[in-house]
Amino acid sequence: MSSIRRYALAALASAVFAGSAVAKDYELLNVSYDPTRELYQDYNAEFVNFWKKDHPGDNVKIQQSHGGSGKQGRAVIDGLRADVVTLALAGDIDEIAKLGKTLPADWQKRLPDASTPYTSTIVFLVRKGNPKGIKDWGDLIKKDVSVITPNPKTSGGARWNFLAAWAYGLKAGGSEAKAQEYVKELFKHVPVLDTGARGSTITFVNNGQGDVLLAWENEAFLALKEDGGADKFDIVVPSLSILAEPPVAVVDKNAEKKGNTQIAEAYLKHLYSCLLYTSDAADEEDSV
């Protein structure tokens, strides 16, 4: 065998083995809150394509876990091996840092906008034609109105609902005592407290319970789009709502153990560059 041929074969073998060494298999777990299923199904497919442009030999599988934000945070504290968390409230991730000790206390400083790649707000979803005439928060405590909202103990969306209701009560009543009185009366109109926002949507949309659903804006629009929802429901934007800022974070110790730190960081950074915003969003000046 000529020296040129031996050199060529050696170079080819070196390239093959080098390629094998570089190519990796990744399995990433994103632990998220309830109504982000569809968002991350779309985003995960987009991210895999993005990653493979620079890492063509890699195999990437992204798993999703969804539920009430508080409940999901508790699961991570108790050992669910999330590489990233994309939860409804910063407080839920703070608890993971404090009790789980799997990421630093200053996690919000690592990504832009306090690690908040997207925002939302709270709106009302009512039956078609709005038969109960629900226009604002004050209408929710009318005698014959039944309100569907998740449990604030387990759901991040429910806590945003609570804060928006409190803000209305404070503005309308002029004192914290009046705000507390309003919120207490509001929850007397809630027949069932599901553990998460998607569960409450099912209760309202599929099971037909309640006159109004307090919903994430994206969840309300999804209800209109699915199964002829536009013929069954209307969205009401109250006079005052809240600017909800769901944060994201890499769970350092979990990602490190699985060799996923680089891809987990890229997963969240890329989230900022490819999100699409709807022109139907509520005006920010109507939020508090």
List each model region and its residues:
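Conserved small/polar residues in nucleotide/adenosyl-binding loops
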Residues: Y277-A282, D286
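Short beta-strand->loop
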Residues: V31-Y33, W107-P117, V126-K128, G138, S146-A172, L224-I242, ...
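Bacterial N-terminal signal peptides that target proteins for export
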Residues: M1-L9
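Ligand-binding pocket segment of bilobal, Venus flytrap-like solute-binding proteins
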Residues: A172-S239
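A bilobed periplasmic-binding-protein/Venus flytrap-type ligand-binding module shared by bacterial periplasmic
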Residues: T121-N130, E245-Q262, S279
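N-terminal segment of the mature folded domain
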Residues: K24-T154
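Sec/Tat signal peptide C-region and signal peptidase I cleavage site
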Residues: G19-A23
